[in-house]
Amino acid sequence: MSSTDIWISNDASTFQKAQLPTQLRHVKVIKIREDSIGRIILLISTEITNEENADPDLSEIFISDSQGLKFSPVEWTPNHQFGNFRLTFPDFLKGTIFGSFHPSIDYSNHQVNYTENIAGGETKISVDNGLTWSNLKVVDEENADSFGCDITRPERCSLQGYFYNLKLSNPSAGIILMTGSVGDDNEFDRKDRKTFISRDGGLTWRVAHNSSGLYATGDLGNIIVYIPSPSYKDGDVQSKLYFSLDQGRTWNQYELVDALFYIHPLELINTTPDGSGSKFILSGHLITTASQEGNNTNISYIARSVLYAIDFSAAF
């Protein structure tokens, strides 16, 4: 297979061939981004190939010089041969990038086992526009014993976000929430997902809730609203909303529905795009259960859609 070239134009008219650190074969450019100082970031992901004697490259991140013509690899190379990168650039934290790598699964192998466990990836943070990267350090003495590794060794025990949903909370003054698990980069159990909070722009993290769910911030991070996702497998239905008025240090709860229903949340947003407001919208479905005649099991069904307006204007 011939190599792939990258062409750059600074005037939308003439193009120059980019200088790459290696030839690109069996790869695809997932996304092209610009950092906060104008450099180009390329996400290069390796494709699985059946060609004999193929020598595929590792998935990499390339970052350009100030002219956008000469690219160098980022010093972050996961120990996987195939995989995909995803980068998240918080608009409210200039220079900060969250990166998540997830190894590819070869579906041609019919021996693949589908379990609650998922192949481990790597999640890292850069605060200098991608020049250097570090693991997401967990600083949470209260919950340290609940993790399967030693959080005092962040190089081997750190917060790992989920590649398909590296979702950060709304804009705030360094207050970020993220769903993930704590471990190394080997394997993660979906049932271990928790919601974590950082108050320093993503450098250190601690547990906010022992479940995954929807979250949004308001008043630039002083207000946090959280509603857990229901766990139907364990019979853990959801009817409560949690909120914090002190950046997630303490939490209160509010009963959304009566005992006849529980809620399946779909979306939770702050009505102010810049995250400064104190009003939120929660949408979802009200779920109820009923037993069928001649059937000992209960059947769940949607009673109706529901929309909540949540206002903390009078909270301060």
From Swiss-Prot:
It comes from the Eukaryota. InterPro entries: Sortilin_N, VPS10-sortilin. CDD domains: Sialidase_non-viral. GO terms for cellular component: membrane. Pfam families: Sortilin-Vps10. The keyword Calcium does not apply. This is Uncharacterized protein YCR100C. BNR repeats lie at residues 62-73, 124-135, 196-207, 242-253. Keywords: Repeat.
